[in-house]
């Protein structure tokens, strides 16, 4: 199982981070060990002093593929959920200054959180999926799939030009504006529409 992630896929988030708007999708990966297993507590990692949440829509790959065309891409994923790409922002900033890869900041154990899956058969319009994140009952991120720079089909097709996609792979499709710091004791809740898909306490 592979975990693909898309960076800078919302204009407002790219701007809040001081990044240029990319000409093509920015792809990075997390290992399988990054996935926080169900019913497993999340602990604040000891190696960072600035842990940030990044709420994202996450796709589940349902069919093996390679070199997928945009117009066929929807056949390769079957469900969506909300998730968190946890980021050690202090480490990431240092790595970016040196032009180094981000794995230490983003790919560590349990840094990828996913909620309950919603089959696309229950989604009225994949280009109009509202989602958000609450921290301690206060909304901190809210966006919609219609604000993505690259939509689901473009992302799947683009990734498949470089990597095979396989059943069970996950794609974190990018975070909108509003990323921020979390500390021990914070409660994070991810939503699609009005449905709570995960609740997590930082321990």
Regions from the language model: what does each represent?
Residues 1-166, 170, 178-203:
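Catalytic-core "active-site belt" of small-molecule-metabolizing enzymes
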């Amino acid at each position: 199982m592979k975990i693909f992630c898309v960076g800078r896929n919302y204009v407002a988030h790219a701007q809040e981070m001081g990044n240029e708007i990319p000409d093509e999708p920015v792809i990075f990966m997390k290992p399988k060990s990054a996935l926080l297993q169900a019913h497993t507590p999340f602990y604040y990692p000891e190696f960072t002093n600035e842990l940030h949440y990044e709420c994202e829509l996450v796709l589940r790959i349902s069919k093996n593929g390679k070199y997928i065309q945009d117009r066929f891409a929807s056949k390769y994923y079957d469900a969506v959920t909300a998730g968190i790409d946890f980021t050690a922002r202090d480490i990431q900033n240092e790595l970016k200054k040196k032009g180094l890869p981000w794995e230490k900041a983003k790919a560590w154990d349990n840094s990828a959180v996913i909620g309950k899956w919603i089959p696309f058969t229950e989604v009225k319009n994949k280009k109009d999926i509202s989602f958000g994140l609450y921290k301690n009952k206060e909304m901190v991120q809210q966006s919609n799939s219609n604000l993505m720079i690259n939509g689901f089909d473009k992302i799947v097709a683009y990734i498949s030009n470089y990597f095979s996609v396989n059943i069970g792979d996950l794609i974190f499709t990018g975070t909108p504006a509003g990323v921020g710091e979390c500390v021990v004791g914070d409660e994070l809740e991810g939503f699609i529409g009005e449905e709570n898909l995960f609740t997590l306490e930082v321990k």
